[in-house]
């Protein structure tokens, strides 16, 4: 009788989220009033109990930076993903042996065929395993043999769903990262860990206090990362990496931006139907309007092939204990993007947007747009900085391209 979203009513959940000023995911997870109240209490308690001073760790270990030895063999996780498969392509141009940890070799081969007409696999070996399992799902002898070979691990595997059961994301993004860390310690290998710029929480979660800038020297800016399952899992994964760094493991963290299609041929991710950014763009085109909250958040268009090249360039400098922000710094506001495309649209109030969206709630693009619109209204804009990363990339001969009208 206290069910807040009878029949799994998503628009109702979104409306409650905006009215009660609480995460929409929490309403999905705890649709009954008593359970919702208990969950809110637990979140507050979890916030109090977070005692790892991540910012101090970043500052302290930054003074311990040192060059790693030349890499001869690398282990790549997530090679079947959109970014991972492009990182693999970049690795094939390096003088290294490449071991790809995959759960399914057939899917791995299918991904290669989908993204590339030609790729040199002469130094690529597949290892059937699973980061979610102890010893990466390998036999003791296989694990030991691999640990003796590997110099660095490029950990790209992740669950990137922004809503769902936290246990699923935690299993991959947190526990999986812990298993990769354990392997790196056993192998005395450098960990190259992919994270996300979304750890800042802008347009997604509230802030506890008012730090409005996220650069490469900080993680905790007061964001209530617990309010979103994806951000929470990636924030906690960074905590694990930083704790390992404090314990002596050489690590780098790469916070990835809004990955978009390749330059040149426009090839995009295979599962583009799940891409939230495309849903938002499609919704704006259908509605002919942009909510006033969302228009203030500029977007980066980070071409996946450029991101992969930047990642590998930085990994192979040998620098360790770094944090990098891998996104194209040539930001676009929604207004600027649609002006370039000569697409007419209006900036409207939240109330007008809600009324229009509810009238079209059966449309998936508009449904997703509503989700992002509501959560963006609860968060302040966070200024992202990556000047340090851009300078380091410049040293490797890399420069981000300007998004053109054609792109």
Walk through the language-model features, giving the residues of each:
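Conserved Rossmann-fold NAD(P)-dependent oxidoreductase catalytic core, especially the SDR/UDP-sugar
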Residues: 154-155, 163, 167-171, 175-229, ...
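N-terminal Rossmann NAD(P)H-binding glycine-rich loop of SDR-like oxidoreductase domains
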Residues: 67-94
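NAD(P)H-binding glycine-rich loop region in Rossmannoid oxidoreductase-like domains
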Residues: 120, 124-175, 185
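A conserved pocket-lining segment of Rossmann-fold NAD(P)-dependent short-chain dehydrogenase/reductase
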Residues: 221-225, 271, 275-306, 310-314
């Amino acid at each position: 009788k206290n069910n807040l979203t009878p029949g799994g009513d998503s628009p109702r959940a979104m409306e409650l989220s905006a009215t009660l000023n609480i995460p929409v995911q929490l309403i999905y997870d705890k649709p009954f009033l008593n359970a919702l109240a208990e969950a809110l209490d637990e979140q507050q308690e979890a916030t109090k109990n977070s005692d790892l001073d991540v910012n101090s760790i970043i500052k302290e270990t930054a003074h311990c930076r040192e060059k790693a030895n030349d890499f001869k063999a690398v282990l790549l996780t997530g090679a079947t993903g959109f970014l991972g498969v492009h990182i693999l392509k970049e690795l094939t141009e390096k003088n290294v042996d490449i071991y790809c940890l995959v759960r399914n070799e057939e899917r791995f081969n299918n991904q290669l065929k989908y993204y590339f007409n030609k790729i040199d696999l002469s130094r690529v070996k597949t290892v059937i395993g699973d980061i979610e399992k102890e010893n990466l799902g390998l036999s003791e002898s296989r694990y030991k043999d691999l640990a003796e070979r590997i110099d660095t691990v490029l950990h790209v595997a992740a669950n990137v769903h922004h809503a769902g059961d936290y246990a699923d994301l935690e299993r991959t993004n947190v526990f999986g990262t812990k298993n990769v860390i354990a392997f790196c310690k056993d192998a005395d290998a450098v960990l190259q860990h992919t994270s996300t710029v979304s750890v800042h929480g802008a347009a997604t979660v509230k802030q506890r206090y008012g730090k409005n800038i996220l650069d490469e020297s900080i993680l905790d800016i007061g964001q209530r990362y617990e309010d979103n399952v994806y951000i929470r899992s990636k924030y906690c994964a960074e905590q694990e990496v930083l704790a390992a760094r404090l314990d002596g493991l050489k690590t780098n963290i790469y916070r990835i931006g809004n990955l978009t299609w390749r330059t040149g041929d426009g090839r995009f991710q295979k599962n583009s139907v799940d891409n939230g950014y495309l849903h938002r763009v499609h919704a704006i085109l259908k509605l002919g309007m942009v909510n006033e909250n969302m228009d203030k958040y500029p977007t980066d268009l980070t071409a996946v092939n450029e991101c992969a090249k930047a990642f590998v360039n930085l990994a192979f400098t040998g620098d360790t204990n770094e944090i990098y922000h891998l996104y194209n710094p040539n930001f676009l506001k929604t207004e600027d993007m649609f002006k370039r495309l000569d697409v007419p649209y209006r900036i409207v109030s939240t109330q007008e947007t809600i009324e229009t969206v509810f009238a079209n709630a059966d449309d998936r693009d508009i449904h997703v747009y509503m989700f992002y619109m509501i959560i963006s209204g609860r968060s302040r804009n966070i200024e992202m900085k990556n000047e340090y990363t851009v300078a380091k990339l410049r040293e490797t001969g890399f420069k981000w391209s300007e998004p053109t009208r054609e792109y």
